[in-house]
Amino acid sequence: MQVWASMDQRMTLAEVAAHARRAEALGYDGLNVPDAVHDGLLVAQAALAATQRLRVATSVLVVFPRSPMNVAHAAWDLQAFSGGRF
């Protein structure tokens, strides 16, 4: 069984990084990030860059205003950047 943390969508990117580090230190397996106030992929990158083992996923990613190719490239890059944690 895995336990994942969530976060407040109004957090700044600096707060996201601190929250992710805290979740990792507390032993959470992952962090679900929203796609609301900030771009969900950018929020995910902030969390991934701040941690070593925490897995990160978007709770929801609004795809209608985004190019499918850009979403695929960004997801691929986040997966590679994080060593498979996205």
Give residue ranges: language-model regions.
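N-terminal beta1-alpha1-beta2 module of alpha/beta enzyme domains
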Residues: M1-T58
